[in-house]
Amino acid sequence: SKKTLEKTHIEKKSLNTKEKIDIAKKACSLIKDGDTIFIGPGTTLEQLALELKGRKGYKIRVITNSLPVFLILNDSETIDLLLLGGEYREITGAFVGSMASTNLKAMRFAKAFVSANAVTHNSIATYSDKEGVIQQLSLNNAVEKFLLVDSTKFDRYDFFNFYDLDQLDTIITDNQISPQHLEEFSQYTTILKAD
C-alpha cells in the first residue's frame, strides 16, 4: 500500500482523546432544540456526534459528509439525519467531490461544525483539498461557523488552506491552549476554551 503523510482515522482517534471530549461537550452545549447543523469529518466531530446522541429532549437535523458521524447517529430517534454522498475517502471516512458539493450548495444551516489539521496566522488548513472544499461550502452556508480543534493544531501547517479565521464565529479548543496562542489567534476570532 502506498505510504501517506496523512494520519489514518485510527491513528487520529487515539490522539488527545480527553481534549476532544471536552471540546465536543462545549460544542454540544451551543446546539439548540430545532437547529439544523452540519457536522464535518474528523475524530473531534465524531465525539460531538456521540455527545449529541446522548442528549435527551432535543430534536435537531444533522447533515454530514462523514460516514463515522452518520453511523454514530443513525439510530437516534431525536435526530433527523442526512448523509451527503459522493466520492469516498477511506482514510478519513468522508464523502467528497462534485456530487457532495452540488448537494451542499443548496443547503443552509443554523450552525456548521468543522475541524482542521492546522491553524496558522489567519488560515485553517487540511491535508485533502477535496475535503477542504466541502468544509468551505458548509461554512459559507451556515449562519454560525465553528471550528473545533485541539490545542496541538495551532501554529501548524498543512497542504490546503480552506478558510480564513476572521470569517469564523468561534474556535472551540481545549484548556491546554498556550497564553501566546490564545492571544495571537484571538485577534482573528472568538476562542472558546472547553471546561
Summary of predicted features, one role per range:
Residues 1-41, 50-57, 74-78:
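HTH-adjacent hinge/linker in prokaryotic transcriptional regulators
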Residues 15-23, 65, 96, 130:
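Short secondary-structure boundary/capping elements
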Residues 34, 57-59, 142, 168:
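A general structural motif
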Residues 37-38, 62, 127:
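Conserved SAM-binding loop
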Residues 41-43, 117:
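Short, well-ordered beta-to-alpha junction loops that form the rim of enzyme active sites
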Residues 47-51, 184:
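A short acidic, amphipathic alpha-helical/loop segment
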Residues 67-195:
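Conserved phosphate- and dinucleotide-binding cores of soluble alpha/beta proteins
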